[in-house]
Amino acid sequence: MAQPTPHAGLQEGLIHEPASEHGGGFPPFQSTTFAAQILWLAIAFGLLYYLMSRVAVPRIAGLLHDRQARLAADLDEASRMKTGADSARGAYERSLKEAQDKAKGIAQATRDSLAAEAETRRKALEADLAAKLAESEAQIRARTATAMGSVREVAADAATAIVERLIGQSPDRAAVEAAYDRTQTVH
């Protein structure tokens, strides 16, 4: 004879008989329980709404308010910083312009002083050169006069020697010098 196995009763319980204990069908879809289900649904949503309006929504509103306040503070700080940066930039630009103007003034003053100094040196050099030129011209005139005086003597001596050789007697020295002077004024 066959002995019952410990799982034999379990297998019998697995046999499915259609919804005998519930009266047939899926309970949420039974029309007899709709009114109770709708009532519990309204109560659950009411409680959920009450909890959300008293707990969650104020927390979210507080977070949004804090965030908005932080954003406004950050925007105000950014505006203050921008104003500060603009004023610093303006001060920097004014300072830079003043420095450039001062540098231009210094450069112009330096150019003017160098030009005046160069002009003074040029005038001194021109005066020195004019003095040296006048001295040189005086020396040239003196040497030319000395040389011309020597030429006159040499020419007179040569003319006297030539005439003496040609005619055999020495001509008058004053006449020879007068003849030389006449030939020099013609040229």
Curated annotation (Swiss-Prot):
Q: Where in the cell is it found?
A: Cell inner membrane
Listed GO MF terms: proton-transporting ATP synthase activity, rotational mechanism; proton-transporting ATPase activity, rotational mechanism
* Topology in the lipid bilayer: Single-pass membrane protein
Q: How does it assemble?
A: F-type ATPases have 2 components, F(1) - the catalytic core - and F(0) - the membrane proton channel. F(1) has five subunits: alpha(3), beta(3), gamma(1), delta(1), epsilon(1). F(0) has three main subunits: a(1), b(2) and c(10-14). The alpha and beta chains form an alternating ring which encloses part of the gamma chain. F(1) is attached to F(0) by a central stalk formed by the gamma and epsilon chains, while a peripheral stalk is formed by the delta and b chains.
- Any Pfam family matching the protein: ATP-synt_B
**Which UniProt keywords are listed?**
ATP synthesis, Cell inner membrane, Cell membrane, CF(0), Hydrogen ion transport, Ion transport, Membrane, Transmembrane, Transmembrane helix, Transport
By what name is this protein known?
Answer: ATP synthase subunit b 2
